[in-house]
């Protein structure tokens, strides 16, 4: 057996081709940790109908950003960068919740290398049962079904880690460099939305998001900021305000220069590359903004990778 430690990066994944969009959506809508559609025995059937109905529109969006999600390549780049920082005692692997490489494939790769000690590191900074909770539940299901024994450790949140806050602040400064003078710019944090019912039932996601915003904005005294939520899906009550509603509100109050900061996303994917860069940018143009920019995503930011390395070292004690 190897004396190395495996670091398993947990991420949601994304379709790696246009043909993969429908099965990716099927996996997503079949997950009762993220969405409960009717009784459990009916969800697979209903999920199949929803995936088939939604896939043509989603395929068009992926076509506009290159025909696939970049999230696998970006997450694998994060894994390689993290392995370089951690050094010889570690191997880093990637497990995607809704696409490839799957959790089962990732664990099989770890097993082939003879590694028995695994740190599961969620790449969702803010804990929610719909994101980290779902990924960890899937990991535990696969472990139980496989019968393979690993020494498991978990990192399930890092919303207030100083290096994560540093990394976000660095990207915001990069974004603000596109504006002059600084005093005229407002900052809009855009986090992935959740059904309000999750928060009502005690999910800590919203509190985590707000704390991240508070800690980041301590670095930007005098800059006006706002928080909104993107990527709603379905006819339930979602966290408010939505990002598109906030864009309208700020435009009505004569805001002309806006930096949008993607929050809860640690790498580029459809929510940044299409929803923000195309859809919200077009809306901002129609609303009369003079300058609308997005701060760069964390991706392989050295400060962010250092954050992940510190999380690994801390959980090992």
Swiss-Prot record:
Predominant subcellular localization, coarse grouping: cytoplasm
Keyword presence, Plastid: no
Recorded GO MF terms: ferrochelatase activity; metal ion binding
EC number(s) per entry: 4.98.1.1
Keyword match Disulfide bond: no
Superkingdom of origin: Bacteria
Family the UniProt entry places it in: Belongs to the ferrochelatase family.
Compartment(s) where it occurs, according to its Swiss-Prot or TrEMBL record: Cytoplasm
Signal peptide feature range: none
Class of the enzyme per the UniProt entry, highest EC level: lyase
Reaction it catalyzes: heme b + 2 H(+) = protoporphyrin IX + Fe(2+)
GO biological process, one term: heme biosynthetic process
NCBIfam families on file: hemH
InterPro entries, per the entry: Ferrochelatase, Ferrochelatase_AS, Ferrochelatase_C, Ferrochelatase_N
Full protein name: Ferrochelatase
Pathway: Porphyrin-containing compound metabolism; protoheme biosynthesis; protoheme from protoporphyrin-IX: step 1/1
UniProt function note: Catalyzes the ferrous insertion into protoporphyrin IX.
Sequence positions that bind Fe cation: 192, 271
Keywords from the named record: Cytoplasm, Heme biosynthesis, Iron, Lyase, Metal-binding, Porphyrin biosynthesis
GO CC aspect terms: cytoplasm
């Amino acid at each position: 057996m190897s004396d190395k430690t495996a670091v398993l990066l947990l991420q949601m994944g994304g379709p790696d081709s246009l043909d993969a969009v429908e099965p990716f959506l099927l996996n997503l809508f079949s997950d009762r940790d993220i969405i409960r559609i009717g009784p459990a025995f009916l969800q697979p059937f209903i999920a199949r109908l929803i995936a088939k109905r939604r896939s043509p529109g989603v395929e068009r969006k992926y076509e506009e950003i290159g025909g696939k999600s970049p999230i696998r390549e970006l997450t694998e780049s994060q894994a390689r960068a993290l392995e370089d920082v951690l050094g010889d005692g570690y191997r880093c692997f990637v497990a995607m919740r809704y696409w490839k490489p799957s959790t089962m494939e990732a664990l099989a790769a770890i097993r082939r290398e003879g590694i028995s000690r695994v740190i599961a590191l969620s790449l969702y900074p803010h804990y929610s049962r719909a994101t980290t909770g779902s990924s960890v539940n899937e990991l535990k299901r696969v472990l139980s079904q496989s019968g393979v024994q690993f020494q498991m450790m978990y990192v399930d949140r890092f919303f207030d880690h100083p290096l994560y806050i540093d990394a976000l602040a660095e990207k915001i400064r990069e974004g603000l460099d596109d504006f002059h003078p600084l005093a005229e710019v407002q900052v809009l944090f855009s986090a992935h939305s959740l059904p309000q019912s999750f928060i009502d039932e005690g999910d800590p996601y919203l509190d985590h998001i707000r704390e991240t915003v508070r800690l980041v904005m301590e670095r930007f005294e005098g800059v006006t900021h706002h928080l909104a939520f993107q990527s709603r899906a379905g006819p339930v009550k979602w966290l408010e305000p939505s990002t598109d509603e906030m864009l309208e509100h700020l435009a009505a109050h004569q805001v002309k220069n806006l930096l949008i900061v993607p929050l809860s996303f640690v790498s580029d994917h459809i929510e940044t590359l299409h929803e923000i860069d195309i859809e919200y940018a077009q809306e901002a143009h129609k609303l009369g903004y003079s300058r609308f920019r997005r701060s760069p995503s964390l991706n392989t930011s050295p400060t962010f990778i250092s954050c992940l390395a510190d999380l690994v070292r801390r959980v090992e004690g």
